[in-house]
Design a protein with these regions (language model features):
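Membrane-embedded alpha-helical bundles of polytopic integral membrane proteins
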Residues: 2-211, 215-223
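Membrane-embedded alpha-helical segments of transport systems
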Residues: 65-67, 175-176, 230-241
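Interfacial loop-to-transmembrane junctions
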Residues: 215-239
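Juxtamembrane boundary at the C-terminal end of a transmembrane helix
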Residues: 240-248
């Protein structure tokens, strides 16, 4: 195993959080989801913005730009308008270099500051926006997605702690989620069609893994808040697209 592979493997499982922490997060979000989609959306916006602000290492003044962009983009999910949300995301991305240049010292590279700000708000914003749109369209699919990610991350946590067959950790962690997905579809516990299991399972597995790898490679020192949400980073938008196209 090369040094790069070891480094990537270590970052892939970086900051998983404790099982109790995962259980509390998933439990609160699921409870809010069943109460009302608006309540869930508001709680999600508050949660991701608080997570980013509390776990960031920068001074308070430096946290304001990414938190502001995060709240702005995440809140558009409450409007249930995908096109408007896409325009807001585009505007936020365009404004990021401007924010990165404000207050930058000569020793700080502009490209590094842009990456730092983007990594601080974009992953969490995509997660909150996707889940907000999803909860407004199909509550059962949103609840199932939260459960799938919970089972995956718990499986990842257990597999890492076992210290056996480390190269198979991503596969072992995925088994529980795919088993839950298959059972839910077969028992009609979700609106997803039975014949959609294979493409959904492939999309879910690839997007979870790709999201964690992307966060691991994005920056040399990703914030803990981003690592905590890395399983959601690409899987939430992909899952939302599956639901929008497969659920009548």
């Amino acid at each position: 195993m090369t040094g790069f592979t070891r480094k990537l493997q270590a970052r892939y499982t970086l900051y998983l959080g404790s099982p109790i922490q995962r259980f509390l997060i998933s439990g609160v979000l699921l409870t809010a989801l069943w109460v009302d989609s608006i309540v869930f959306g508001v709680l999600l916006v508050l949660f991701v913005s608080g997570l980013q602000a509390s776990l960031a290492n920068e001074a308070v003044a430096l946290r304001i730009p990414p938190v502001a962009l995060l709240v702005l983009v995440s809140a558009t999910g409450l409007l249930n308008d995908g096109r408007f949300s896409a325009l807001v995301i585009l505007g936020a991305i365009i404004s990021t270099p401007i924010l990165a240049g404000i207050g930058r010292t000569e020793e700080q590279k502009l490209s590094s500051e842009i990456v730092k700000i983007l990594s601080a708000w974009l992953p969490l914003a995509l997660v909150a926006l996707s889940l907000g749109l999803l909860s407004a369209r199909d509550v059962s699919s949103a609840a199932l997605f939260l459960c799938l990610i919970f089972f995956h991350d718990i499986g990842l946590y257990v597999s890492v702690r076992s210290r056996s067959q480390k190269r198979y950790v991503p596969l072992l962690a995925m088994i529980g989620s795919l088993a839950l997905l298959w059972t839910s579809i077969q028992m009609a516990a979700t609106s997803l069609p039975p014949d959609g299991f294979v493409p959904i399972a492939i999309g879910l597995a690839l997007s979870i893994s790709a999201g964690r790898v992307a966060i691991a490679l994005w920056t040399s020192d990703p914030p803990a808040s981003i690592c905590l949400a890395s399983s959601y980073f690409l899987s939430a938008p992909i899952w939302t697209l599956f639901v929008l196209f497969l659920v009548p």
